[in-house]
Amino acid sequence: KAQALDLADAVSYLPHKVHIEKGTFSDCKDSDIVVISVADSSEGPLRRQNTTRLDLLRPTIGMIKSIVKPIVDSGFDGIFVVISNPVDVVTNYIWEKSGFPKNKVIGTGTALDSTRLRRILSEETGIAQQSIQAYSMGEHGDSQMVPWSHVSIGGKPILDMIKDNPSTYSNLDLPSIVEKNKKTGI
């Protein structure tokens, strides 16, 4: 119920009327989307040093096992959106266990990492995020990478900007930006 109240408070930012309440698995039957956002709050392993999103796999799958079947059994035929870490592995697990087609089980993957990358680049350059095109690719975790040859600011490739304006951009430490992006949010 507390989570439902928190979400109900947040709907003031939405442009249309939304009703949120505490429910049961059977309520999923008529839902268009179910967001899977489970985490093991007893340990908080990502809060400890030298841990990764993959360290959450065992406790997360343990929780997922108890919810996917009841949701599917309710008659739910919508879309699963997965944000639980490790999101790529958990998304695949839910896809396999639900029996849903691939296009109905979606993980956020590196979409969030890409927006974080744009924010970090904005902070480092002083240029608005809206003018930055950048994508983090691969697994949402330690193996993600940034294809710098495809990053642009105001339509100009960032590698050209660094080369053409060394006094302004030579301090950009691209490997450090990638590492910062990987560790943000954990």
Predicted segments with their positions:
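Short, internal active-site loops enriched in acidic
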Residues: 26-28, 85-89, 139-141
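Conserved N-terminal Rossmann-fold NAD(P) cofactor-binding segment
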Residues: 2-31, 40-48
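Structural signal for conserved beta-strand scaffold positions within catalytic alpha/beta enzyme cores
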Residues: 22-24, 107, 134-136
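Rossmann-like NAD(P)(H) cofactor-binding subdomain of soluble oxidoreductases
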Residues: 51-119
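C-terminal substrate-binding/catalytic lobe of Rossmann-fold NAD(P)-dependent dehydrogenases
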Residues: 98-104, 112-186
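Redox-cofactor binding/interface segments in oxidoreductases and associated redox assembly factors
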Residues: 34-36, 82
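Residue-level recognition of the N-termini of beta-strands and the immediately preceding loop/turn
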Residues: 16-20, 78-79, 103-104, 132
